[in-house]
Structures are given as structure tokens and as C-alpha cells.
């Protein structure tokens, strides 16, 4: 048996090896139990856990990391289902083909499916989960049409991470606040489809030829751009009144920093931005950015980086790393 405490969670591994007496002795203080599931769990031990360790305000996180997560059947967790608020499924060795049965977790708030999973995995049951706010389909295939149909019905979503998103295929998601896109295909409708978006992160997306769609995001507070190496230009962002943070990383063709609004608080530019020189930052000054609290500039050259950072010395926090 393996039990530990991490970030205010009680973490339980190898539950199948626990005796009833050991489970009865568990002292859960943080009201969060994180179950690490690497094999089909023993139903009796789950019942014991419910009997001895689960309180009225206990929340359960399930972390599925078996060699083949397809062998883990959700119905075995039925006795704990109402307490499960978070499910993370990491598929490092075998492709996950199904999440059938996941709708028993009526209080599920967060679902992450990572690494190897069937590109066409059926998500239909998620529509029944009215409290689902966070969905991540991470690092595998692009969305298919049936998956779009499901996502378009997840009106409670606040955070979404996906690959291959095409905004033309989305319906309005009025509650979405945080979007992470890998290989974004089309972003032209994001401002309209996600009117309350506050944070957007865009990773390597070779089909994106410009970022003008950012200008339609009137509620946006944070913009992070990573690996958009085919873009030489970011539009001026000074008319985004709520923008407070921007990060730019690994944009090897970017030639000029965009104009930023005076309310900006955090600026981060680093890693493989060879076309950016000191002159590219001519408007990055304390006068133009009077509310800046933190700035990182790493142009791969200490002298050039420091020439920009020194403008903010003793004004805000500065770093190259």
C-alpha cells in the first residue's frame, strides 16, 4: 500500500493491496482523495473506502494510468461516483478506444484525456455531465465532426484544450474563458463563438497565416503564442482593453513587437526569436507600459536582452530566465 499527501491531497496508490483494516485507518484531512489507478480496482476495497474514508464534503480525483486503460471499467466506481469531480486518463502505452460509462459521474467537473487515444473516440456521454467545466483532449488527433457536435453542447465548459480546432465548426460557447489550441486550423470566429474568452494559448499551428482574429476578443486578458514559426507579424493589440499578459516563444520569423495597451502587467518574450532585435522593442518602455509588473526578455544574447530590461530596472521585476 502506498499513501502520501501532495498539494493538500491524500494520494492513494495500489488500493487493491490494502486490507479493510488499513483502509479503515486512513485519516483524510484535506477533503480531497486522489486515487491512482493502474489496474482494475477491487470493488470491495472501493466500498471500504466509501465506508471509512469518504465524508460528506470529500472530493475524489481519479487518475487512470494503467498500461491499458481500456481494462478499467467506470461502473466499478459506482459507489464513489457522486464524489468524483476530476478524471485524468493518461495513455502512455495503449490507445484508449472508449469512455463508455463515464456519464455515471454526475458531478464531474474536469476530464483530461492525454497521449494515446482514438482520434474518433466517442464523447457523446459528456453531454449528460452538466457540471463539466474543464475538458482536455491533449496531444493526439484533431477533432472529428461527431466530437464537434458534442463540444457544441457542453454549455458549462469554462476551459478547453484541443488539437486541430476549426472555429468555423463551433457553435457559441458563451461560458468558455480559457482556450488552449494545438495545431489551430482556423481562428477567425473565435471572438464571436467565445465572447467571454479571457485566456488563449496557441501552440504550433502552421495553417494560421495571421492573428487578426485576436482583435475580436474584447474580454481577453492573457495571450500566449508558442511555436508560430511561420508568422512574421502580430497585429497591434493596444485596442484590447483587458489585456494584461502576453507571452511569445519560439516565433523565429517575428520581426517586430506589436503595440501593447498601457494596462499590460506581464510581458514574456523568449527562445528562438532571432529576427527580433533591440529596435523591435522600441515601444516597450516604462512610459508606454506604466503598469508593467514583470518582464522577461531572452533574445539569445545577454547584451541585447539587457538593453531592453535595463529600461525597467528598479521599476518592475525583470529577468532573462
Enumerate the predicted regions with their spans.
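N-terminal amphipathic/basic-hydrophobic helices that include classical n-h-c signal peptides
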Residues: 1-7
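Concave beta-strand-loop units of leucine-rich repeat
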Residues: 11-19, 31-48, 56-76, 83-101, ...
Amino acid at each position: 500500500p502506498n499513501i502520501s499527501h501532495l498539494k493538500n491531497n491524500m494520494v492513494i496508490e495500489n488500493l487493491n493491496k490494502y486490507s479493510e483494516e488499513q483502509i479503515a485507518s486512513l485519516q483524510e484531512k484535506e477533503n480531497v482523495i486522489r486515487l491512482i489507478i493502474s489496474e482494475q480496482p477491487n470493488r470491495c476495497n472501493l466500498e471500504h473506502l466509501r465506508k471509512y474514508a469518504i465524508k460528506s464534503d470529500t472530493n475524489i480525483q481519479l487518475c487512470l494510468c494503467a498500461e491499458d486503460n481500456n481494462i478499467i471499467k467506470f461502473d466499478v466506481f459506482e459507489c464513489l461516483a457522486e464524489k468524483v469531480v476530476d478524471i485524468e486518463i493518461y495513455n502512455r502505452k495503449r490507445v484508449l478506444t472508449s469512455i463508455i460509462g463515464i456519464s455515471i459521474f454526475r458531478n464531474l467537473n474536469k476530464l483530461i484525456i492525454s497521449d494515446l487515444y482514438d482520434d474518433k473516440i466517442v464523447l457523446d456521454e459528456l453531454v449528460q455531465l452538466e457540471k463539466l467545466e474543464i475538458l482536455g483532449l491533449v496531444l493526439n488527433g484533431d477533432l472529428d465532426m461527431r466530437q464537434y457536435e458534442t463540444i457544441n453542447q457542453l454549455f458549462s465548459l469554462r476551459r478547453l484544450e484541443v488539437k486541430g480546432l476549426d472555429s468555423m465548426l463551433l457553435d457559441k460557447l458563451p461560458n468558455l474563458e480559457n482556450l488552449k489550441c494545438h495545431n489551430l486550423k482556423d481562428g477567425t470566429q473565435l471572438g464571436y463563438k467565445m465572447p467571454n474568452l479571457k485566456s488563449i494559448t496557441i501552440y504550433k499551428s502552421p495553417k494560421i497565416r495571421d492573428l487578426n482574429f485576436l482583435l475580436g476578443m474584447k474580454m481577453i486578458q492573457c495571450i500566449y503564442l508558442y511555436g508560430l514559426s511561420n508568422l512574421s507579424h502580430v497585429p497591434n493589440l493596444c485596442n484590447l482593453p483587458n489585456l494584461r499578459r502576453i507571452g511569445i516563444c519560439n516565433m523565429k520569423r517575428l520581426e517586430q513587437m506589436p503595440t501593447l495597451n498601457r494596462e499590460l502587467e506581464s510581458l514574456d518574450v523568449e527562445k528562438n526569436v532571432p529576427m527580433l532585435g533591440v529596435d523591435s522593442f522600441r515601444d516597450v518602455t516604462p512610459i508606454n507600459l506604466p503598469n508593467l509588473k514583470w518582464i522577461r526578455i531572452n533574445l539569445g544574447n545577454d547584451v541585447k536582452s539587457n538593453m531592453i530590461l535595463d529600461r525597467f530596472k528598479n521599476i518592475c521585476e525583470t529577468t532573462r530566465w
